[in-house]
Amino acid sequence: MATTHTLLSFDNLEFLLHRKDLTDLYGKRCGTLNLVINPYELFLPDELDDDCCDDPFNCCFSDVYASIGTEYSYIDPPDLIYEEHCATNGTWPDGTPCEPILPPFTITGTHHYYATKPGEVVSGILSKLRVFLGSLLRSTADVNSNFTFRAESDGPGSTEIVTEEQGTIVQQQPAPAPTALATLATASTGKSVEQEWMTFFSYHTSINWSTVESQGKVLYSQALNPSINPYLDHISKLYSTWSGGIDVRFTVSGSGVFGGKLAALLVPPGVEPIESVSMLQYPHVLFDARQTEPVIFTIPDIRKTLFHSMDETDTTKLVIMVYKNGADTKTTCSITVETRPSADFTFALLKPPGSLIKHGSIPSDLIPRNSAHWLGNRWWSMISGFSVQPRVFQSNRHFDFDSTTTGWSTPYYIPIEITITAKVKGNNHWYHVIAHDKALVPGIPDGWPDTTIPSEVHASNGNFDYAKGFHDDKEIVNPANNNTHFKGTYICGTLSTIKDPEKAENQSESQKKSSTMYVATADLGDNKVKPQHKISSQKLVVYFDGPEKDLTMNATLSPLGYTLVDDQPIGSNSSTVVRIATLPEAFTQGGNYPIFYVNKTNKGYFDKATTDCYNSQILMTSQRLAEGNYSLPPDSLAVYRITDSSSQWFDIGINHDGFSYVGLPDLPADLTFPLTSTFMGVQLARVKLASKVKVTRNSIK
């Protein structure tokens, strides 16, 4: 009897694979195939037959020897083992005993045997099957040099074509290399990216149309660019160039009620639209506002190069202008604009995420999404409202799309660092200051306030001299009752240090190293402090309780509040706004009005009281313009939709100079904060900005 296992037989193979499959392989039909496998052919050459080998360690067939497995030890002689094996492993359906696939190798004088590895048996069977199936799959077509393919027509065939040789010859392409075919086959097994955004229209903007608009008034003008579709704008960040048209769908909200006609014009690249009926000389169509179905236009891509760069704005424009109003009474409707890419739209030339392109990017992130992140660029508190003005101005910390400023401060709030050289004279409260060397503009500290005092005062000791009747704890009653010597200055907390404080003579002065200072831009001389609207290193003054001896102090200041002058917001009077040379300004244009962003500044002396402060930009807008690389034509606006919690909304447009505009002469006082901002694209500055708000005659404070 065997002491370990029996020899590998067909019965073992049935267990490893499947009994039915192996039964089919051993002489029976397998599906539609007829394959017979002789197991002796898997390992032994034909001339060896089924004889046993008596010298396995000097095998004449090295490949056969490599398939030999573990040595098995038996007590009984080979003949007895063979008979026992046949008796214990059953028979096939035809009565034939299950014999071993390969007779064991024997070593003369012992009863040690070597059996074939099971994996080698399975591999041999699969190899035979592969060869057999390959012969069946081989093409039997005649592929000589005269062989051609011919195409079939999609429509009814011509009666003249009676043989296949008369069809249209389809040119054969060179067959891809096997490695390329393998790559394509692997890639095709993955799930392709869905492109449903190519088929549906996405909201872009809304347009207000009033019957008071004159004929030829441009309501909408849009140059072809990926930024007018939210999905194209998102994907464009991965590419350097684009090409193709965009479909635009207009839906008039007053359809069936609101009368009048509009003209849709296609303006070629290089031509700027004007508000005149002469624009109808360009290709155009007219559509009636009373029609209930949306109107779809396609902005075609007219170009002289293969692709457009992402900043290119000299492209085909779609212009919507008033052709004819249908009523004498004032009525208004809203036109919803939606976009989708045309079938020929495509991107090209991938670029790494985050890489900068020299021509500039789309100005889509100048205003933070949530108003909780809106700080002013004049004062560091949160924006709480807007003020629409016919004229807006600011120099310091105001940046344009060229990343330039006419001011002296960086777009960050940092402590003001100055040096004060005190000379004791008759006045020991007003002092000139010297800026540190790391200032943006030499001689002027970074962050120095940009307003001056309202009027000339004596350079003497002062206090909060608010006479009775000036303020009633809520608001200013009579501005004339303000006799404070340092009104109009900014109140700063300080950290002051004195050189060599360990000296005995400086001990008393070192006790004053941290005291409140009042700073301003003014002209100090002849015991007088005069207003100065042009800043320079000689016009920087501070008011504080100075030392009683000559010494030099270094001070780090942090603005905390403002010494109240009157009931006017800080920065609302251009005569008190400080500049280096010129003062950047913005005026009403194209029915759009410039705005200040309003926040609150603490007032000195009055407990928990604040006053309004006007800012020309949101601080993050200043930061992005100073550090970024944005592309915006001089006659265009980067448009953001501002929406409050009650679904009121209005558009803010930022022009190339960095100033902001709205399309209303007043904004409602009941906007519910926080607000949200959404980038809507770029439009002409002459086109009125859209809105949907309850208009009042009061600006937000």
From Swiss-Prot:
CDD domains: rhv_like. Pfam families: Calici_coat (PF00915). Transmembrane segments: none annotated. It comes from the Viruses. The keyword Transport does not apply. The record marks 152-153 as: Cleavage. Coiled coil: none annotated. Gene3D superfamilies: 2.60.120.20. GO terms for cellular component: host cell cytoplasm; T=3 icosahedral viral capsid. Keywords: Capsid protein, Host cytoplasm, T=3 icosahedral capsid protein, Virion. Belongs to the caliciviridae capsid protein family. Homodimer. Homomultimer. Interacts with the minor capsid protein VP2. May bind to VP3 and Vpg proteins. Capsid protein self assembles to form an icosahedral capsid with a T=3 symmetry, about 38 nm in diameter, and consisting of 180 capsid proteins. A smaller form of capsid with a diameter of 23 nm might be capsid proteins assembled as icosahedron with T=1 symmetry. The capsid encapsulates the genomic RNA and is decorated with VP2 proteins. This is Capsid protein VP1. The lineage of its organism: Viruses, Riboviria, Orthornavirae, Pisuviricota, Pisoniviricetes.
